[in-house]
């Protein structure tokens, strides 16, 4: 057995979980997942859609859908990207928003992703589709590096593969990185998509697949695993930093430990001694007496070999010394959603973190008669099969989460309840919001449809919520959300009027008066609200001369200041939002971004493999103007027919090196010509490229 080394430091500073997002079977988001767990929901079912005819499992809906435009990814590249990358991009965006961090903030954030599956890469290679985007689309390293690149994260960026314990092993690395000061914030993720039947057959050949299609953790009926899929993302900060910033804390991570069996009966047979060792070390590092642990989220796969070993290891470390009437409660989310393999650990951790936050333990399913090979009473263990609330006198709570990889890498994480604190009482001075004082509430989206969807979601969130201070809502809208190109602002004095204007924005009935400064306003209503819409960078000369001129001055009161701040936001100008909303405002929880997803999938009917051969007959003739414009717009991911500055360099237009290769390849394929790798270097603007393709020297010849 491999000896453990203390890489994080015994009793190191706790780390706070300040943001979470997930997409699991039967649950499209964190709230849906908690509802599924509380009601004891079973999300196992037969394959459907792209997985039609597959054996029962925990499947995600609509894995082909993705909001490529938001992330600046062309449709062509999106189709060649592993859906696991796409899923992580969207969930990372939501996890940051949940942590009240603007997704465009960037900074010294580390990214640690657990994954052990490459089904889309397998599909790509089997189809012989080779393209400039194939490497970045399917290589596993880009599960982490894609996040770091898009979000502007400068901390460590790593993919961890320890099999089924990958996501908890990734969390262990994140803890070490935070405590060493390599990053100030960490994003930890786990992802698993079961896109082909090959993975099913591999597990079946190993003898680990449940023939009944249900996970029976620690039960007499245990007959193997049920595969599941999904992803979860956590945002972590040092606890002191999170408390100082006023962050919501779901729970704390007190410690983690990872080891390996280092031998045993076989490569895939778990070892009790190693599991006991990793448990002992985790609680030593956390400074927690194992007898005080309230609950452990099991690895709990429901296999005949694995469950008894795990039970005996738990009983030997955490059950010892407990009175018979206070056994350790255990359970497994695999009974709800299946075994998520590379994402299994993070699924169990999100369940446990939510349980600590709500102080309520959801039931574990499919446990009716104990496994005869597991002496639950003697080990002081009890499977928690009913929903139960933790009582106030049971805190502060400590829980554990286990995840064991096929091949012997074991991980255990110790979680603690968030510190209990009361919000600072209002002191002397201005209240958070003076009655009747106008407050700007901001919205933005990458498309008009996204903006309307955000308005509808926010109206639903605010409707009937008398407890929400408009200044808190406004501050959150200004500081915890990305400021995207399509913008709107509502200046309101009361929640009902704000909700009414948001509904008008959602329905597109808010008016369209356009000012010379580029903003659009429907005028100040009798209820004191004003609605502004527009885009950053709008110029007065771009507007029709018949439109109204600048608004007349309305004095120097708060209404003028609020409207001026709203107009500045709409036009992309800087604003001191803390000064606008005041020092008492605290960001409220807002709806998460409404992605505008479309289907993208690998096209295996045609090969995308490189330019035509040198002796190929030309397949295209005509003016290259439309060809270059259409291909460039498509590769940039812009709407068909979008304007393009022909004299701007391809770099300034947004083409990176991979996009440049894709453009050269597409032009070559369309024209039937063999083009040099330096094509866009030699002709760096669309106008230059069009002229080169038009010249007599290139027609009917190789273009070198």
Predicted regions and their residues:
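Regions immediately C-terminal to embedded phosphopantetheine-bearing carrier domains
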Residues: 1-11, 520, 525, 565, ...
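Condensing-enzyme catalytic core of the thiolase-fold
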Residues: 2-433, 481
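Phosphopantetheine-attachment site and its flanking helix in carrier
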Residues: 15, 83-86, 305, 410, ...
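Flexible, low-complexity linker/boundary loops enriched in proline and small hydrophobic residues
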Residues: 18, 385, 401, 415, ...
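Thiotemplate assembly-line natural product biosynthesis machinery
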Residues: 87-91, 613-642, 659-670, 691
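Phosphopantetheine carrier-protein modules
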Residues: 155-157, 633-655, 670-679
């Amino acid at each position: 057995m491999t000896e453990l080394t203390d890489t994080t430091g015994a009793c190191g500073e706790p780390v706070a979980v300040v943001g979470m997002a997930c997409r699991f079977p039967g649950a499209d988001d964190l709230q849906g997942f908690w509802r599924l767990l509380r009601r004891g929901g079973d999300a196992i079912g037969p394959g459907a859609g792209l997985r039609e005819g597959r054996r029962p499992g925990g499947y995600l809906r609509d894995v082909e859908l993705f909001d490529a435009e938001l992330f600046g990814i062309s449709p062509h590249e999106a189709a060649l990207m592993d859906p696991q990358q796409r899923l992580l991009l969207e969930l990372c965006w939501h996890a940051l928003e949940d942590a009240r961090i603007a997704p465009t903030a960037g900074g010294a954030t580390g990214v640690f992703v657990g994954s052990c599956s490459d089904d889309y890469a397998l599909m790509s290679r089997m189809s012989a589709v080779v393209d400039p985007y194939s490497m970045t689309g399917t290589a596993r390293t880009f599960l982490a590096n894609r996040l770091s690149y898009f979000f502007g994260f400068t901390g460590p960026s790593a993919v961890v593969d320890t099999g089924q314990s990958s996501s908890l092993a990734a969390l262990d690395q994140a803890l070490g990185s935070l405590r060493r000061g390599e990053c100030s914030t960490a994003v930890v993720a786990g992802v698993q998509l079961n896109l082909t039947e090959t993975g099913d057959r591999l597990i079946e050949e190993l003898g680990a697949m449940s023939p009944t299609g249900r996970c029976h953790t620690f039960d007499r009926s245990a007959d193997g695993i049920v595969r599941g899929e999904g992803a979860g993302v956590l945002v972590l900060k040092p606890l002191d930093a999170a408390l100082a910033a006023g962050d919501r804390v779901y729970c704390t991570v007190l410690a983690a430990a990872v080891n390996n069996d280092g031998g045993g009966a076989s490569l895939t047979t778990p070892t009790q001694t190693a599991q006991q060792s990793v448990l002992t070390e985790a609680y030593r590092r956390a400074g927690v007496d194992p007898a005080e642990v309230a609950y452990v989220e099991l690895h709990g796969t429901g296999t005949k070999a694995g469950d008894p070993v795990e039970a005996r290891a738990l009983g030997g470390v955490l059950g010892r010394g407990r009175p018979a009437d206070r056994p350790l409660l255990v359970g497994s989310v695999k009974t709800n959603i299946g075994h998520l393999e590379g994402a299994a650990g993070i699924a169990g951790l999100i369940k446990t973190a939510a349980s600590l936050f709500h102080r309520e333990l959801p039931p574990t399913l499919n446990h009716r008669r104990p496994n005869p090979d597991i002496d639950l009473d003697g080990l002081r263990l009890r499977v928690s099969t009913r929903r139960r609330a933790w009582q106030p006198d049971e805190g502060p709570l400590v829980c554990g989460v286990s995840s064991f990889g096929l091949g012997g890498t074991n991980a255990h994480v110790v979680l603690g309840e968030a510190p209990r604190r009361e919000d600072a009482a209002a002191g002397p001075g201005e209240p958070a919001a003076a009655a009747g004082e106008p407050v700007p509430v901001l919205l933005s989206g990458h498309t008009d449809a996204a903006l309307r969807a955000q308005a509808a979601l926010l109206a639903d969130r605010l409707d009937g919520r008398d407890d929400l201070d408009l200044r808190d809502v406004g501050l959150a809208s200004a500081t915890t959300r990305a400021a995207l190109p399509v913008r709107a602002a509502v200046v309101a004095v009361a929640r009902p009027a704000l909700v009414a204007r948001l509904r008008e924005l959602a329905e597109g009935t808010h008016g369209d008066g356009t000012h010379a400064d580029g903003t659009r306003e429907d005028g100040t209503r009798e209820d004191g609200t004003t609605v502004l819409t527009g885009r950053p960078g709008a110029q007065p000369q771009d507007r029709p001369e018949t439109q109204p001129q600048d608004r007349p001055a309305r004095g120097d009161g708060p209404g003028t200041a609020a409207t001026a701040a709203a107009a500045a936001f709409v036009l992309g100008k800087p604003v001191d939002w803390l000064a606008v909303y005041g020092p008492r405002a605290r960001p409220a929880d807002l709806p998460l971004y409404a992605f505008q997803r479309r289907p993208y999938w690998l096209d295996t009917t045609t090969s995308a493999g490189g330019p035509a051969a040198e002796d190929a007959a030309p397949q295209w003739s005509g003016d290259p103007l439309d060809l270059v414009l259409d291909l460039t717009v498509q590769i940039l991911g812009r709407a068909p027919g979008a304007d393009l500055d022909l004299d701007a360099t391809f770099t300034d237009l947004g083409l990176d090196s991979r996009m440049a290769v894709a453009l050269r390849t597409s032009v070559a394929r369309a024209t039937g010509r063999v083009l040099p790798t330096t094509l866009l270097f030699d002709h760096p603007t669309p106008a230059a490229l069009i002229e080169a393709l038009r010249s007599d020297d290139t027609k009917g010849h190789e273009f070198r």
